[in-house]
């Protein structure tokens, strides 16, 4: 079955305190701080004993920062990789500096990236580093074959055979392949003490709105990870007019696409007058509301450039959407109207009547998350992924002046849609979701996340993150903590800065630390008028939901 990341329904930096030594593994040397003064360093650990955050008592202004570090500074500060106990031979490349006070680096070993790795530096207003959050591998085992290309070709043949099993060969298309170092901990699937092994990662399109990502060990061809993705949610809007798509047909993916040369032709494109189809106009307007909110309240800048798609039809890279789609498959039969919406491969797809502002913002934020930190869609990182989509979806809903923004609907997800209200961020328990970490309604971590356990409770456990966002924004006395809200403008910038810091395998503990760090950075950089008093309220909210 295909996976819907629909509107319905992580340990960081491995190895600092690890005592497990795998045979043949190359371990990191004793973590000298290099050019950093160890007396200036405060190290925080996760519950599993891994390095989670480095804070400097005095901001680091030493070389190579003779002057304030600019957005173009591409080198990690000397000694920081040792503090995170990076594997020998590691170097770090800058992969994001779109936010002037947050810099995100990827770990590489011998020039090959480590999947899921990152070290994020947080800078003050003068460009000095105040803290860092990281997820790195501390050791490697094995080596890539001397003939890298030949090894990759052999692994591709194996991966293609697996991806093609039970599928029409015409539906399988390779979209990306690369050599990587694979450490299961960094994608939330391994135990403390694991090491990085040489591997190849292959991404295939395997059917309707579906992709499959296979990671193959370079040394023995073992399958290290097998993931099927479908992200449930530019301005090019196409109308399917209740056309039924067989999800199991070999050409279903092509039948979904929106563009002049695609199966679904544009009904309304940028600058055109309103359509006679209400859902087309709703989506056209809400795509704009989402892009405008991100542009005004985050450093994401151009949302079209970040998550848009170019179908080669002369309309360029655009935020594309198909409305009024119907679907059928062998398990659920025909669904018309299709009571859902989803994001996949730069395009939004909606069933009739689910074209609301919060659902649009929710699903497009899955695209933003995919392009920023790539939160793994399982267990706690998956719950944070879902919560981030609810948070920004509701921020957009509460800020665009829509007629249904009543007091009763504030913090409700799905109001005005054919689904009705499906979640309450203010009161998650009303819909069977937890408001406190590992409290009532919490779904346990799954050792084998799959559709039967909601990938480890990604929709249910998002309630903790949703309650947290409500508390930070509006405030409330809850679970022994009194929180004064800081408002949407400050909260949106706070969550955006935290989004930039989170690693792919983030836990709720990681989210709490990232929010505290982001708040301090926003004060130092005078973002949205954030104050130290606001940060006290953020800390109180984090305590209230039990994630610190």
Curated annotation (Swiss-Prot):
Alphabetical list of CDD domains matching this protein: M4_TLP
Family: Belongs to the peptidase M4 family.
Active site: 363, 459 (proton donor)
Subcellular location per the Swiss-Prot or TrEMBL entry: Secreted, Cell wall
EC number: 3.4.24.-
Record-given protein name: Zinc metalloproteinase
Database matches in Pfam families: Peptidase_M4, Peptidase_M4_C
Segments of skewed composition (Polar residues): 442-459
Main location: secreted
Cysteines engaged in disulfide bonds, as pairs: none
Top-level taxonomic group: Bacteria
Region spans: Disordered: 440-459
PANTHER family noted in UniProt: BACILLOLYSIN (PTHR33794:SF1)
Enzyme's top EC category: hydrolase
């Amino acid at each position: 079955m295909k996976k819907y990341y629909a509107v319905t329904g992580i340990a960081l930096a491995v190895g600092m305190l690890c005592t497990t030594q795998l045979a043949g593994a190359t371990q990191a040397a004793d973590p000298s701080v290099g050019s950093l003064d160890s007396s200036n360093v405060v190290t925080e650990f996760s519950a599993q004993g891994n390095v989670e955050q480095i804070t400097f008592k005095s901001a680091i202004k030493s070389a190579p920062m003779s002057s304030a570090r600019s957005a173009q500074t591409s080198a990690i500060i000397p000694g920081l990789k040792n503090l995170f106990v990076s594997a020998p031979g590691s170097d770090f490349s800058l992969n994001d500096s779109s936010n002037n006070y947050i810099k995100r680096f990827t770990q590489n070993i011998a020039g090959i990236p480590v999947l899921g790795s990152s070290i994020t530096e947080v800078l003050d207003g003068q460009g000095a580093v105040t803290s860092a959050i990281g997820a790195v591998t501390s050791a490697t085992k094995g080596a890539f074959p001397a003939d890298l290309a030949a090894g990759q070709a052999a692994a591709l043949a194996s991966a293609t055979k697996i991806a093609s099993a039970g599928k029409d060969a015409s539906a399988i298309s390779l979209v990306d392949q690369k050599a990587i170092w694979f450490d299961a901990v960094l994608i939330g699937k391994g135990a403390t003490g694991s090491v990085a092994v040489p591997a190849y990662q292959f991404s295939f399109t395997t059917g309707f709105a579906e992709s499959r990502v296979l990671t193959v060990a370079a040394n023995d061809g073992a399958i290290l990870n097998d993931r099927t993705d479908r992200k449930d949610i530019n301005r090019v809007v196409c109308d399917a007019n209740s056309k039924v798509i067989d999800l199991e047909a070999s050409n279903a993916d092509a039948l979904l696409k929106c563009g002049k040369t695609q199966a679904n032709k544009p009904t309304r494109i940028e600058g055109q007058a309103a359509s006679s189809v209400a859902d087309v106009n709703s989506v056209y307007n809400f795509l704009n509301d989402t892009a405008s909110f991100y542009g005004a309240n985050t450093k994401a800048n151009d949302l079209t450039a970040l998550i848009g798609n170019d179908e080669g039809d002369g309309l360029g890279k655009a935020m594309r959407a198909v409305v009024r789609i119907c679907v059928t498959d062998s398990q659920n039969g025909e669904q018309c109207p299709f009571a859902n919406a989803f994001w996949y491969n730069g395009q939004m797809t909606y069933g009739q009547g689910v074209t609301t502002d919060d659902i649009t913002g929710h699903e497009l934020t899955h695209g933003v998350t995919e392009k920023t930190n790539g939160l793994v869609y399982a267990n706690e990182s998956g719950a944070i992924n879902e919560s981030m989509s609810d948070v920004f979806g509701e921020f957009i809903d509460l800020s665009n002046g829509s007629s249904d923004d009543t007091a009763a609907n504030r913090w409700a997800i799905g109001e005005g849609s054919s689904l009705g209200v499906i979640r309450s961020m203010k009161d998650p328990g009303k819909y069977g979701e937890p408001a406190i970490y590992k409290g009532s309604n919490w779904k346990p971590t799954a050792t084998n996340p799959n559709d039967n356990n909601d990938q480890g409770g990604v929709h249910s456990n998002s309630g903790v993150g949703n309650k947290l966002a409500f508390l930070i924004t509006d405030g409330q006395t809850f679970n022994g903590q009194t929180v004064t809200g800081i408002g949407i403008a400050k909260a949106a910038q706070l969550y955006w800065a935290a989004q930039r810091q989170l690693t792919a395998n983030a836990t709720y503990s990681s989210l709490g630390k990232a929010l505290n760090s982001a708040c301090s950075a926003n004060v130092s950089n005078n973002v949205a008028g954030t104050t130290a008093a606001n940060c006290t309220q953020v800390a109180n909210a984090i305590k209230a939901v039990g994630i610190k």
